[in-house]
């Protein structure tokens, strides 16, 4: 409960959250805890030891809340809150409107190093310039300038109230009192300049006020080290006062401090650690940074380093000794490591042997080749072929007056073969006991060549009708026609079987009757 209230107060006051520290005592089976809380730079401890850490922290928070409640309203805390929220800029703008002066103008100057800049801002209000504390950024520098201007105007109000015997009214707003004091200040300046033109005008610049530092004791330590206050004493009662002569000498030579034989004069605290800040003996923001030593790694393919100077033999003085010889580094040998997935070595072209080629085509062909003419045969026995296609029979014709071709053969002559017997074969005659098939008689084939072939083929003599024998090779026929031809041959063999003489006479008589 108390921890939540203290945290809420810190958030409303724009402070950092309270930080708790714990002290543990006793054995492990029965520990004791004592807590302390840091609120806005102040330390509050619990009154005693507790069995749990939670109880100790709540007790420390309760002590902090009780101490803050007894103090009453804190003007320093209120000023800190206004400074964080930036209300002083609005207050200065309101005062400028009441006085009838232009709005305040801010001028910021940057100084310091590139990575650590320092901004200093000045604000001009009613012809008067106010300078604020330096800050790390421009926005905070403007807030500091507005706060310095407001504190300076409040000092002006107090000076005017002390000079005059008029009672100060607490009910009046502070902005109105500051505006009245600023108007009186400008009126007095005009009257003084009117009476004496050669008189010096009133000061137009108000630097930052020292009371602002006393009002915020923690702000001075925020920009410095947090360890330094722990080593320094809390009171200056043990420190030895310095004489004005020594202070003058120190001001003349700030970079050469004299060392005292007594170590306690340098460290006033008896039990303090010997802490001497280095920054006190050099100019701030203007000194050169110490050199940086970078340790370099030795490369892989480099010569071995030289031995240390202690390991070397004692050398003679430089005047008596010879100049050191020049040492050459050992040569570096790099062994190429081929990658794993490299292609195989490319083989060179194999030697070619010259070969002499004799052309055979130039020799004259001795044997004459007769032209092959495609012949189409129409078979009259349609029943035996049973729907099969008519075979195309290649016919070889020997020309009597053929001359040996020189380079190419004679063109092929298409020949159409017509069957002489166009009548279909009659059905077998049933005589006597059974059906006797007729013997298969192959008619002569008449070959007739077309007219174009007659004109083209001059060597052919005689009539255009040529008697040729159509021989069909079983390899040139398809399977279906081959089966049909085999069946016809089987029937022909059956027809040539020996029969009786009586049956033959009956067949002849029957044929004569028809």
Swiss-Prot record:
One record GO biological process: miRNA processing
GO cellular component: cytoplasm
CDD domains: DSRM_AtDRB-like_rpt1, DSRM_AtDRB-like_rpt2
Repeat listed as a keyword: yes
Keywords assigned: Repeat, RNA-binding
A matching Pfam family: dsrm
Residue segments, region Disordered: 195-268, 455-496
Function: Binds double-stranded RNA.
The protein, known as: Double-stranded RNA-binding protein 6
């Amino acid at each position: 409960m108390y921890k939540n209230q203290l945290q809420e107060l810190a958030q409303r006051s724009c402070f950092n959250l309270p930080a708790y520290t714990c002290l543990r005592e006793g054995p492990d089976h029965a520990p004791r805890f004592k807590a302390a809380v840091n609120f806005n730079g102040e330390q509050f401890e619990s009154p005693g030891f507790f069995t749990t850490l939670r109880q100790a922290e709540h007790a420390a928070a309760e002590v902090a809340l009780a101490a803050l409640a007894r103090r009453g309203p804190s003007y320093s805390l209120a000023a800190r809150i206004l400074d964080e929220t930036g209300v002083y800029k609005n207050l200065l703008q309101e005062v400028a409107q009441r006085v009838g002066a232009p709005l305040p103008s801010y001028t910021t100057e940057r100084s310091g190093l590139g990575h650590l800049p320092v901004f200093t801002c000045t604000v001009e209000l009613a012809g008067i310039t106010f300078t604020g504390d330096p800050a790390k950024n421009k926005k905070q520098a403007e807030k500091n300038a507005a706060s310095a201007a407001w504190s300076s105007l409040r000092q002006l109000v107090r000076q005017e109230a002390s000079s005059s015997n008029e009672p100060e009214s607490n009910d009046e707003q502070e902005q109105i009192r500051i505006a009245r004091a600023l108007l009186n200040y400008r009126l007095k300046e005009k009257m003084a300049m009117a009476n004496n033109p050669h008189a010096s005008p009133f000061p137009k610049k108000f630097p930052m006020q020292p009371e602002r530092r006393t009002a915020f004791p923690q702000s001075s330590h925020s920009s410095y080290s947090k360890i330094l206050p722990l080593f320094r004493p809390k009171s200056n009662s043990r420190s030895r006062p310095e004489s004005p002569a020594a202070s003058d000498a120190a001001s003349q030579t700030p970079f050469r401090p004299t060392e005292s034989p007594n170590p306690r004069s340098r460290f006033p605290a008896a039990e303090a650690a010997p802490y001497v800040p280095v920054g006190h003996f050099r100019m701030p923001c203007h000194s050169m940074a110490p050199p940086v030593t970078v340790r370099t790694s030795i490369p892989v393919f480099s010569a071995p380093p030289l031995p240390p100077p202690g390991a070397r033999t004692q050398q003679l003085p430089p005047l008596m000794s010879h100049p050191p010889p020049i040492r050459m580094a050992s040569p570096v040998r790099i062994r190429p490591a081929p990658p794993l997935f490299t292609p195989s070595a490319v083989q060179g072209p194999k030697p070619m042997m010259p070969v002499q080629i004799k052309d055979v085509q130039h020799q004259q062909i001795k044997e004459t080749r007769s032209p092959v003419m495609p012949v189409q045969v129409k078979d009259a026995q349609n029943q035996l072929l049973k729907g099969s296609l008519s075979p195309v029979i290649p016919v070889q014709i020997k020309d009597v007056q053929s001359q040996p071709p020189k380079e190419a053969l004679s063109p092929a002559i298409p020949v159409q073969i017509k069957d002489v017997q166009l009548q279909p074969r009659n059905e077998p005659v049933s005589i006597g006991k059974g059906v006797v098939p007729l013997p298969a008689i192959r008619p002569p084939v008449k070959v007739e060549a077309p007219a174009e072939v007659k004109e083209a083929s001059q060597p052919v003599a005689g009539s255009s009708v040529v008697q040729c024998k159509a021989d069909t090779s079983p390899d040139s026929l398809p399977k279906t026609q081959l089966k049909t031809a085999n069946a016809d041959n089987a029937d022909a063999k059956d027809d040539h079987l020996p029969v009786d003489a009586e049956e033959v006479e009956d067949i002849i008589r029957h044929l004569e009757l028809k």
